[in-house]
Amino acid sequence: MPVFRLTEELIFPPSYLAERDGLLAVGGDLSAERLLLAYRQGIFPWYTEKTPILWWSPDPRLVLFPAELKISISLRRVLRKNVFSVTFDRAFADVIRRCAEVRRARDDSTWIVPGMVTAYSRLHRLGYAHSVESWHEGELVGGLYGVALGRVFYGESMFTRKTDASKVALVHLVDLLTRGGFQLIDCQVTTAHLQSMGAREISRRRFLTLLAENIPEVVHGESWEGESCCGKRP
């Protein structure tokens, strides 16, 4: 199938027209309006400094249903010991910067290019993009960020500089989302790490159905800073 080239018009082709690898469209921009439209339709940007903006809608899709989170025995020990303190939306800029510093082994590149940092920082200011931070002795040692729409959270990236730091951030995120009535966490691309924590693949068709059921027509952004962690204040 052809890969569609986007124009200034705020529109995407249907996701079922994506290539076998999930590539759907090329070009466009990273405006807040386009990004929110993309997420609503199950599409996300993923590209490098050497390529134009690429838009993806893979099939199957890796997702984590909050109730299916798996916590290993060793991770439960870490949680009981309170090795890390966890916060929300307290250091978004630092989290996305640390995630961008994680390089892909095969070509030493990153998909979190400066344009992506700018775009998601804008979404954060609008209350749609959020971060979860894991701290150890006052130092940011792990975390993740993503986008929340309705009852769906779209995970974008995570980093860790101390064993289990990002896993602890994910556990606290799932707790917050569960208490907030969220039904789905989009993990985008399949990885063994996320599968080990309970994520599983579903068809694109089912994924899009879940989005339609859980994202209302009008969605307002809000800050998560100051939210409690697993029932405790951060």
Swiss-Prot record:
Record-linked Gene3D superfamilies: Leucyl/phenylalanyl-tRNA-protein transferase, C-terminal domain, Leucyl/phenylalanyl-tRNA-protein transferase, N-terminal domain
GO cellular component term of the entry, any: cytoplasm
Pfam families in the cross-refs: Leu_Phe_trans (PF03588)
Protein keywords: Acyltransferase, Cytoplasm, Transferase
Domain of life per record: Bacteria
EC number: 2.3.2.6
Its job: Functions in the N-end rule pathway of protein degradation where it conjugates Leu, Phe and, less efficiently, Met from aminoacyl-tRNAs to the N-termini of proteins containing an N-terminal arginine or lysine.
Protein's recorded name: Leucyl/phenylalanyl-tRNA--protein transferase
